[in-house]
Amino acid sequence: MKFRVVVMMEVLAGIAFFGFNSASVAAEWESTLAAAKKEGKVAVLTDVTATLRDALTLEFQKNYGITVELFGSSGREVAPRVAAERKAGQFLWDIYIHGSTTALEAMIPMGAFDPLEPALILADVKDPKTWRGGAIEFLDPSKMVLVMTPFHRGTIFYNTKLVDAKEFKSHKDLLNPKWKGKMVVDDPRRAGPGVATFTFFYLHPELGADFIRALGKQQLTILRDYAQEVDAVGQGRYPVLIGTADFVAITRARQGVPIAIVDARQLKEGTDLSPTNGNLALFNRAPNPNAAKVYINWLLSKDGQTIFARANGYVSARLDVPTDHTEPWRVPLPGAIKTYTKAAMQVKDNLQPLLQEVFGSQ
């Protein structure tokens, strides 16, 4: 009898605790939302296309009546911009939605971010069971940069009118003499998808440095603008493109441009796992701290992640977000090579000298 009483008391205590906790969360959310509406806006620094702009602004503004001021900038431009602003005493941004390399190698060392975890309020956002792997993934030990969209990237892009995708069963097929002088590559000596692709090549046991050297002999045309890279292939000036931004190629394909991505499942080596520009961080000294919290929790909700993933053709780290909008090969596989972690980026000490050897100095 005593045992039953004790158990019942524990159950009631648990119900009371969770009820209190739920009420506490609701109160915190309402308080934050009220303060956010007084601020009236949130400033977001990101990569941007028209589709992504709509995804990151329209639904949030409709739901909360808070204006989203969005500025699109490439990863290579973000750090110099923010550094110059801060040197001048300007703290203009609330939210960072961008790449891993820029975050780890520039923004965090600059001291630009606050830890993100304290900004998470909504229960389903904080619940580890919501996320792939049973936990929210962060890039760094201080939990400043949250990984929203880990997925298998494209590495080989091609003009569908000029190339049969079946020609590629391995990345080594890029070494076929028929492609010599006919391929574009995103500059791997700078931050971006190009260096992520070559990091994958370098880390893969069946590719490595020898493959990179051989690829360098294929007279690649090096570009530094994603749109120019994709358009060069889409317009038929080059049949093949290596390592560009997936979201730009996807956007062009939706517009009817004849560009596609080789299915990673048909490539012997597969492709790497990366969130590309799907990382989320909170700027410190944010001008609209409450609106930033509301935006973060909305973006990490099921609705926010569904909109974001669909706009980019990405796969969300949330398990309850559908993946029917993208190719099945995008969904993360166990054991895939991650090119966005600190450990992966540390190989650059060896990779960058190799790239300078192969492609010359910038």
Report the location of each language-model feature.
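A bilobed periplasmic-binding-protein/Venus flytrap-type ligand-binding module shared by bacterial periplasmic
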Residues: 155-162, 199-203, 275-288, 307-308
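Mature extracytoplasmic/periplasmic domains
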Residues: 278-339
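Extracytoplasmic ligand-binding site segments that recognize negatively charged/polar headgroups
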Residues: 43-57, 69-83, 91-230, 234-237, ...
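Periplasmic-binding protein-like
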Residues: 212-216, 221-223, 256-284
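Bacterial N-terminal signal peptides
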Residues: 8-20
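Immediate post-signal peptide segment of exported/extracytoplasmic ligand-binding proteins
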Residues: 25-43, 61-62, 175-181
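A ligand-binding cleft/hinge motif common to bilobed small-molecule-binding domains
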Residues: 103-106, 239-260
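Extracellular/periplasmic bilobal clamshell ligand-binding domains
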Residues: 322-362
